[in-house]
Amino acid sequence: MKNSLLPASFEPLLSTTDTPGPALSDLLALVGEELRADRCFLYLRNPKTVMGRIAFCWCRDASIPNVTESAWKTDISIALKDPLFAAALRTDPSIYVEDVKVADPAVVNQDFEARTFGHRALIHAHITEGRKLWGILQPCVFDQPRQWLASDRQLIEELLPRLLPLVKAYIRQTLG
């Protein structure tokens, strides 16, 4: 790809759908390292059943909370308390939050973010197809605000459509 910001190490993982679980897990680590994030998780959902869960989570070290969820659950009610999730369900463009503590309350529920995730800055990257939400990639940092650079944004936006086949394959294998 010309002008691609995706590192070459991403390509073999993005090219497989036979083993989507391990590929997605490994990709989170690569994304986390590339963006110098503290944590990177992947929320997956089946848009037909509206069942979702945080299926994968990479943490820079053991001091960072791992938020992986074991059970799939209906996710529509999350949108009532989380405007970021509501935006994802609408398939709005991805949202880059530089500081949760001063973000617009119409965009970020600061109390919900602090209580549920504890991060300070995040990317809420929506994996969509048409008007359907298939997942959310969420790199974040904890102790300080973070200005997300144009190169960070380009990497995320280039990666999202490439993740979709893996996400769909994982959901098919896991939920049928």
Describe these PLM feature segments.
Residues 85, 127-142:
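Sensory-domain boundary capping and coupling elements
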Residues 120-128:
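A short, aliphatic-rich beta-strand micro-motif
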Residues 1-25, 33, 54, 169-176:
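Signal-transmission linkers at sensory-effector interfaces
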Residues 86-95, 102-105:
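Soluble sensory domains of the PAS superfamily and closely related sensory modules
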Residues 11-15, 27-36, 42-46, 89, ...:
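Short regulatory alpha-helical segment in sensory/regulatory domains of signaling proteins that mediates
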Residues 41-76:
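GAF sensory/regulatory domain recognition
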Residues 98-121:
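Signal-transducing coupling segments at domain and membrane junctions
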Residues 141-159, 167-175:
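Regulatory loop-to-helix N-cap segments in sensory/regulatory domains
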